[in-house]
Amino acid sequence: MESLLNRLYDALGLDAPEDEPLLIIDDGIQVYFNESDHTLEMCCPFMPLPDDILTLQHFLRLNYTSAVTIGADADNTALVALYRLPQTSTEEEALTGFELFISNVKQLKEHYA
């Protein structure tokens, strides 16, 4: 069975990447993909990690109300948006999930970055 990432690229009308799976969306949104046997994870850094603890708490509270999870990158320098899809997702579900993810990231960048 073809991987979910390849099926997503097909649905987007793109060729699968030969090296690091990365999509750059028109307004500077960089989506990195990590695929395992069970999930396809989409990750997008969207702003520097806030110095203010109240701002950080605000972002973490968003995790209770959205399918997109907010976290910090491995270096604790940026906030990242994460979204996971099961490998059993259809092309249509993958495309819908990708569009939801991009929409959420754009909203986060608009309102907070």
Curated annotation (Swiss-Prot):
Functional note: Molecular chaperone required for SopB/SigD stabilization and secretion.
UniProt organism field: Salmonella typhimurium (strain LT2 / SGSC1412 / ATCC 700720)
Induction: Transcriptionally regulated by InvF and SicA. Also regulated by SirA.
Compartments where located: Cytoplasm
GO cellular component: cytoplasm
Family matches, as InterPro entries: T3SS_chaperone (IPR013095)
Family that this chain belongs to: Belongs to the IpgE/SigE chaperone family.
Subunit text: Homodimer or higher-order oligomers.
UniProt KW Ligase keyword: no
Any Pfam family matching the protein: Chaperone_III
Top-level lineage group: Bacteria
UniProt protein name: Chaperone protein SigE
SUPFAM superfamilies hit by this protein: Type III secretory system chaperone-like
Keywords assigned: Chaperone, Cytoplasm, Virulence
Main location: cytoplasm
